[in-house]
Amino acid sequence: MTHSTETAGVRRIDVNCDLGEALDAPGGWRGGHEPALLPLISSANVACGGHAGDARSMREVCAMAVQHGVRIGAQVSYPDREHFGRRALDIAAPLLAESLEEQFSDLVAAAAEVGGRVAYVKPHGALYNAVVTRDDHAAVVVELAARHGVSLFGLHGSRTATRATTLGVRFEREWFADRAYLADGTLTPRSEPGALVVDAAAVAARTTRVVSDGHTVALDGALIGTAFDTICVHSDTRGAAELLAAVRAAVLATGATIGAA
């Protein structure tokens, strides 16, 4: 079953996107398509230095998020800018905890400068996938959220979901509109054909289905139950703005509203 916030009997679904990731060759912030994406979302996952982002990008993206009334989240990552945080790292848990704390704190400072606050944590890339099954790294991520009293985004059924419940952390289950799923409910690796869903009509159709009956068709055709609170489109997916517009239209057409939890 699909679960999300309800107000006066009307379901409210969050829509999120990864922002603050566009860097030029020397590594400085050059801006991206945030101005086009922010009006389409209710939560912004802001890169905070692990895989991308710097002080300027964090400050500017947070300022735009505040202007649009969009919730700010820390998109923490393995410390691996070279591979954009998409390579798994066998890093010791204490070192990972130190890195994630620094990333989170940097974003908190940037948000505060522009009158914003960080409301949640979302792991990025390889870390997101690792904490589905890796206990020690899942513990680091959940403890970060618990320590700062914020929510945590993640995959339904992951180790982070279980640990979040134990520590009293609000866990917001995420569904990806632009990513294909395997039959076990995990994301299809980006290296495999069909891992990305870039057709707006296809994104709209699968969004309509998951909101209406709580199911996703896996890459192999299997029908999988999908519980979620927030829907993601990656900003680096081709045509991200068009895909987000398709998600919004599909959600609203079901009678649900869009907004942060």
Model-based region annotation:
Residues P189-A261:
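C-terminal alpha-helical cap/extension of soluble enzyme domains
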Residues G157-H215:
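Active-site rim beta-loop-alpha module in soluble metabolic enzymes
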Residues P35-P39, E60-G73, A112-G115:
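Acidic (Asp/Glu)-rich catalytic clusters
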Residues D80-Y120:
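Glycine/small-residue-rich loop that forms an oxyanion/phosphate-binding "nest" at active or ligand-binding sites
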Residues R30-G31, R134-V140:
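Charged helix-capping and loop-helix junction motifs
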Residues D24-A55:
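A short alpha/beta connector and helix-capping loop motif
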Residues V46-H51, L96, A130-T133, R147-G157:
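Catalytic beta/alpha-barrel core
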Residues D18, Q75, V121, V233:
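Conserved, mostly hydrophobic/aromatic
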